[in-house]
Amino acid sequence: MSNNVIIFDTTLRDGEQALQASLSVKEKLQIAYALERLGVDIIEAGFPVSSPGDFESVQTIAREIKNSRICALARCVDNDIDVAAESLNIAEAFRIHVFLATSALHAEHKLKKSFDDIIEMGTRSIKRARRYTDDVEFSCEDAGRTHIDNLCRIVESAINAGATTINIPDTVGYTTPYQFGGIITNLFERVPNIDKAVISVHCHDDLGMAVANSITAVQAGARQVEGTINGLGERAGNCALEEVIMAIKVREQMMNVQTRINHKEIYRTSQLVSQLCNTPIHANKSIVGSNAFAHSSGIHQDGVLKNRETYEIMTPESIGLKEVQLNLTSRSGRAAVKHRMEEMGYRETDYNLDSLYAAFLRLADKKGQVFDYDLEALAFMGQQQQEPDEFVMNYFNTQSGSSTVATASVSISRKNEEITEAATGNGPVDAVYQAISRATGYPLKLVTYQLTAKGEGRDALGQVDIVVEYQGRKFHGMGLETDIVGSSANAMMHVINSIWRSEQVEIEKRKHHTTQEAV
């Protein structure tokens, strides 16, 4: 048996079914290119008979992608198979994937056919698909709830008919790892021609066990895993391919299998899919979540600084991230604060660690996460970090509509001076940002803008989190109001005042160094 596990991605087919709006052909091609760079073996590009748009997408991807084999889905219906072949025939080699429900529940209530009829339908469709290609996959839909005797019968018949890959889906995420592994083991023990096909698995996550079921199946002999990037999919989603891939890599010695995936493309691919599909990745998502390699506990931070393997079973670099992230919070220890100061180029003689750490804890209790510019302000400005903001928003007004250019005016106080400015923008938020930039004199570049709802209904608060770049440094801001534009304005004012403090830090640092040189 081969030690290579084939990675079959169905983000563009099964994953897209979960989206409120379909992806465009251009967007699907972007994802296909990313999957090709990732090293995915099989890309299921769509269900061509379902719509002209899906047909065009599959055809375009089949024409453009050269290093991954393109696959199209078809029911066990002659026209489905013919249309799938037509969409794929531009490629040098391709796969047709036919599926048919095999559980008693589906046979009785959906198909209304006997199991003998189902076997006949499946074998006939496989033979038809083999007219177009020698790479045919057959899926036993709802295999997880199919009686094992029937499952063995149809798998044997499908292989005899010419299927080169047999897929065993846990369509509704019903099985447990022990049970699902047992199904795969039974197939290998009871199907006499099992060695003539690759056994594949396709697990859904309704009970949160899609990845565990897939890994157990590989240990039982399956050599293809199907899933989607970020676990995208209907209901609770599909098996998250990035998790399976990294599980195989991290536990390679135990599992004795590998993939041909370029692991350093994982994070980049995940971010692209999230962006194009408009599906945010949860911070605690395994492998690709923003907290996956972030350490906040002081004990953990101290351990990671001494030896990363104490609390990291894989490196962020292994998935394409640059470095480990130590989040400075009230749970961080002195070692993490000292390390961050060293990373910024400061020596212990430049500041008093005891005083800095005490001030850091006070700020962290109040603010939550402390950033580099906050730390510098504490080190070189002391209590000035706690003083009132330099710039204060008095009011803002916006005007926008479908037939007018968005405009905004702002009034900002700086000490005893009132500054008023107006600007236009690409929407009311952008107009406010342009006006704030003019009023304060800071040319800003918005890097990220994230809006999340806090609560429900008319009284829900809109939290705006932004990252802004100024002179090569990134500054974070947060605003929280029922009015989204107001939240956005507050977030930007937060940034403006952080930038001003960072400038005062530079002034204090120069004074500090001048004093040291004089001594």
UniProtKB/Swiss-Prot annotation:
Pathway: Amino-acid biosynthesis; L-leucine biosynthesis; L-leucine from 3-methyl-2-oxobutanoate: step 1/4. GO terms for biological process: L-leucine biosynthetic process. The keyword Hydrolase does not apply. It comes from the Bacteria. GO terms for molecular function: 2-isopropylmalate synthase activity; acetyl-CoA C-acetyltransferase activity; manganese ion binding. SUPFAM superfamilies: 2-isopropylmalate synthase LeuA, allosteric (dimerisation) domain (SSF110921), Aldolase (SSF51569). Residues 392-519 are annotated as: Regulatory domain. It is found in: Cytoplasm. Its cofactor is Mn(2+). Keywords: Amino-acid biosynthesis, Branched-chain amino acid biosynthesis, Cytoplasm, Leucine biosynthesis, Manganese, Metal-binding, Transferase. InterPro entries: 2-IPM_HCS-like, 2-isopropylmalate_synth_dimer, AIPM/Hcit_synth_CS, Aldolase_TIM, LeuA/HCS_post-cat, LeuA_allosteric_dom_sf, LeuA_bact_synth, PYR_CT. Homodimer. HAMAP family: LeuA_type1 (MF_01025). This is 2-isopropylmalate synthase. The gene is leuA.
